Amino acid sequence: MNCLEILISKGYNMQGYSPDTLLLLSEKEGNDVEECEAYFSWLEAVYG
């Protein structure tokens, strides 16, 4: 699974985020929720 799928499965609403954020989350492979949440926080700060 990629981080985008993991976050959606955890109930995150991904509407309204920049295409860059969504693309990078979908490209990041992972299975650790905490790692994906940390990456998402960083992407939010950089891309919105």
From Swiss-Prot:
Q: Tell me the superkingdom of the source.
A: Viruses
The protein's name in its UniProt record: Uncharacterized protein ORF48
Species of origin reads Acidianus two-tailed virus (ATV)
